[in-house]
């Protein structure tokens, strides 16, 4: 067993004794505590990273890809308050709401001796309230906190030697190795800094920072939110949910469009940070030039790969979209933030969809 992993697991033993269960507190996000546990929503106890029982652990139907990390998502809304479902499916949360998302990996405990912590690919998050620290590595926990003046984004990086995650406004770089059938892939997991958090969570120029994932059709268990009292029990979904990886239930085009909406549309929309590209990838955008169909590139430099169109119907290998999804060069790769490795399954989905499109440019 590599020394780094041995050390990691020995450190887990230091934090497995547990602490009294804290209370969830909605603190002033303008002056956040250094320790994640001070918020009370996520903490280490009994050898697990746990979510407070007053919070709701939830999952998304089509989540954002983040270097094959699993994500433990949780939301807490103060007693007596509810989120309101807007006409477009976004949720309007009350003041005091705390949303947490912990990024973690299953540990791959095979002998490699690379000096990096070796982790396994995860296919999702799920709704388990506890993460076993004997077999998993938490990397970071991100908080979104709703105050009177809007949302605040806070990042905490995990230090298992102290059984705690600490505020990291400058971000962090964590060397890891991703195990696979053909060996390991070394990569650097990037914990975003405060500016990067704000950049992605402002889907409109000059707009307010806001949550991206929890829209009504994205919630994998809508009824659980209603049963907990976090949503009006009479509220209805604004659109049919789609799971990007469920080929048995959902058509190829629906799955590909849902994937692009979740992974790209917060920037690629008419008012977003990537509006100058003219590429709009939200679910409400019809399949036309704005979605990339036979659309020439705009100021992408090497990002075009000498390909003429974002999407060339029937020809994924000739499509800029696939070229950029399949690339890791920072000057070429898309999305440009949030990933250091290629999402093989997501890229394959978009390739299959483009291959199925009829017509010519």
Residue ranges and their predicted role:
Residues 20-87, 93-95, 100-107, 122-126, ...:
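Conserved small-residue
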Residues 17-27, 115-361:
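Sequence context surrounding c-type heme c attachment/ligation sites in exported
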Residues 6-16:
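Bacterial N-terminal signal peptides
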Residues 106-118:
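Internal, charge-rich low-complexity segments
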Residues 86-88, 112-113:
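Short, glycine/acidic-enriched capping/hinge loops at junctions between secondary-structure elements
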Residues 1-4:
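Positively charged n-region of N-terminal signal peptides that target proteins for export
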């Amino acid at each position: 067993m590599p020394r780094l992993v041995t050390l990691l697991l020995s450190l887990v033993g230091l934090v497995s004794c547990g602490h009294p269960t804290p209370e969830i507190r909605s603190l002033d996000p303008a002056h956040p505590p250094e320790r994640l546990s001070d918020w009370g929503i996520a903490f280490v106890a009994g050898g697990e990273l746990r979510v407070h029982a007053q919070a709701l652990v939830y999952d998304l139907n089509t989540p954002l890809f983040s270097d094959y990390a699993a994500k433990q998502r949780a939301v807490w809304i103060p007693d007596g308050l509810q989120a309101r479902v807007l006409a477009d499916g976004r949720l309007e949360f009350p003041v005091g709401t705390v949303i947490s998302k912990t990024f973690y990996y299953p540990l791959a405990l095979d002998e490699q001796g690379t000096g990096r912590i070796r982790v396994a690919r995860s296919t999702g998050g799920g709704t388990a309230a506890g993460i076993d620290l004997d077999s998993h590595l938490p990397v970071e926990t991100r908080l979104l906190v709703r105050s009177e003046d809007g949302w605040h984004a806070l990042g905490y990086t995990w230090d298992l030697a102290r059984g705690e995650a600490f505020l990291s406004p400058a971000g962090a770089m964590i060397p890891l190795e991703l195990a696979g059938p053909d060996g390991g892939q070394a990569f650097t997991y990037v914990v975003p800094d405060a500016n990067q958090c704000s950049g992605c969570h402002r889907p409109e120029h000059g707009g307010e920072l806001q949550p991206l994932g929890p829209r009504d059709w994205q919630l994998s268990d809508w009824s659980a939110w209603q049963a907990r009292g976090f949503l009006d029990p009479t509220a209805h979904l604004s659109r049919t949910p789609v799971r990007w990886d469920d080929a048995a239930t959902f058509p190829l085009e629906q799955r590909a469009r849902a994937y692009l909406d979740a992974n790209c549309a917060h920037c690629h929309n008419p008012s977003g940070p990537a509006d100058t590209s003219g590429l709009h990838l939200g679910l409400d955008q019809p399949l036309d030039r704005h979605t990339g169909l036979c659309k020439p590139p705009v100021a992408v430099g090497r990002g075009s790969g000498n390909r003429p169109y974002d999407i060339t119907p029937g020809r994924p290998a000739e499509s800029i979209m696939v070229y950029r999804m399949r690339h890791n060069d920072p000057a070429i790769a898309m999305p440009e933030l949030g990933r250091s490795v290629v999402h093989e399954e997501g890229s394959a989905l978009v390739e299959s969809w483009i291959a199925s499109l009829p017509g010519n440019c």
